[in-house]
Amino acid sequence: MATHGAMLTQDVVGGKWYELFTSMFLHFGIDHLASNMIVLIAVGLPLENLLGSGRYAVIYLVSGLAGNVLSAAAELKTGDFAVSAGASGAVLGLMGAVIYCLIRHRGRVGGLSLRRVFLAVFLTLYMGFTNSGVNNAAHIGGLICGFVLAVLFYHPKECRSQHDRQTGWIR
């Protein structure tokens, strides 16, 4: 994995900054990929519906990068280096964004509820902290970044009307 674009903090510091990006698109097996994609579908589709494709993509990519930057910073501080890959920082960023949108909508958007999303985030973080080999810093960094970006990007009337114009939907 390290030779195919997974993130090694030592390499990033040495000039391979692109690993902060490429590692988001690599996974350590089908289970790793599937777990990220299931959450991506469950949370991502309703979020894209609210924000539109452009804002959604920005939140996904920037949250993934922010998670990887926090991960690299944590590794540099602790000296505990590991190969890192996966979309979970970006996916947790989407969950952070959905949390903000749900707060703005009093806890419900489509089939999502604030309680269920909080439970999913809690279980994800709990499993990460109780198992080895999980990049908790990337999860937390992505989650926080996604929430902050949603605060900046999500303006319900503007987002809905822009999305409606793009898709031709009338609500």
Regions found by a protein language model. Name each.
Residues 1-171:
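A detector for small-residue-rich transmembrane helices and their helix-helix packing motifs
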